[in-house]
Amino acid sequence: MKRARFVVLGSGAASPAPERALPAHYFEYEGVGALLDCGEGTQFQLMKAKISFSRIKVVFVSHLHGDHVLGLPGLLQTMAMASRRDELLVIGPKGLKDFLLSSFELTYFYPPYPIKVVEVLRDAEITYRNLKLKVFPVNHTVPAFGVSVETASKRKVRADVLEREGLPKRLWGRLQRGEDVVWEGRVFKYEDFTFEGERIKVVYSGDTAPCERLVEEAEGADLLVHEATFTKELKEEAHDRGHSTAEDAATAAARAGVKQLLMVHFSARYKDLRRHLEEARRVFPRSYAAEDLTKVVILK
């Protein structure tokens, strides 16, 4: 059985609030962790969630507004103080590399471990070990991206069929690797005798107003993590500022046919999220409002 976990480290928006940290989220599958955005204070939230910094192999920055990125230089320095030696993959928009290099230079920081920065201009698909990250543009006031994180899937053999056909088990592994097998003059095509195992798919919106591309990329996801900065009476303001309402998030979830919606990125003006939930559940019943350190475990 596949098991992944998603942890909301910071459920707030641009203005900090005592009860809500700035945007940051963590996805982990088979020991490989991906940090999705890194607002100020993310280090403290990781410690509260008991997530080891060394488990973070990939960092995705959705855009360069401060509430999504200003926690990253400090986190990278703390990783160095913890004697990190593993490479860290950092993915984000154009300008992220200059931002990091400037912060390193001005704070006299010389990373003792390799940091690979991949800047995305439009679309990108990046595979890291057992994770496939698909980065796509969303609808914000500055260049901004959402991301689909999908677990790798190993092909599985149709054991009952292969046993009936008499193919020796020692050859099954080749079919699993996507190779055709010739045995006793017969060709066994891998696509006829194997099938794709189930994948776990989580999609994170970053900051966005309603976005058709996001709906397309979220299709069938196990979890859609979507910003819901405002409720619908502030819909016009939300869209003008490149943000979504709870109703917008639920509409995206319903159209994409996702299994669950987790709303995040709440304006500091909201102390009570009941209106967000009521608004969203009228459109998509499986809607939830995140608190800091909310954890979702996905099993398949």
Curated annotation (Swiss-Prot):
It catalyses: Endonucleolytic cleavage of RNA, removing extra 3' nucleotides from tRNA precursor, generating 3' termini of tRNAs. A 3'-hydroxy group is left at the tRNA terminus and a 5'-phosphoryl group is left at the trailer molecule. Binds 2 Zn(2+) ions. One of its GO terms (molecular function) is 3'-tRNA processing endoribonuclease activity. The keyword Cell membrane does not apply. Pfam families: Lactamase_B_2 (PF12706). Keywords: Endonuclease, Hydrolase, Metal-binding, Nuclease, tRNA processing, Zinc. Its cofactor is Zn(2+). Its EC number is 3.1.26.11. Zn(2+) 2 binds at D67, H68, D207, H265. Belongs to the RNase Z family. Zinc phosphodiesterase, which displays some tRNA 3'-processing endonuclease activity. Probably involved in tRNA maturation, by removing a 3'-trailer from precursor tRNA. NCBIfam families: PRK00055.1-3, RNase_Z. This is Ribonuclease Z. The lineage of its organism: Archaea, Thermoproteota, Thermoprotei, Desulfurococcales, Desulfurococcaceae.
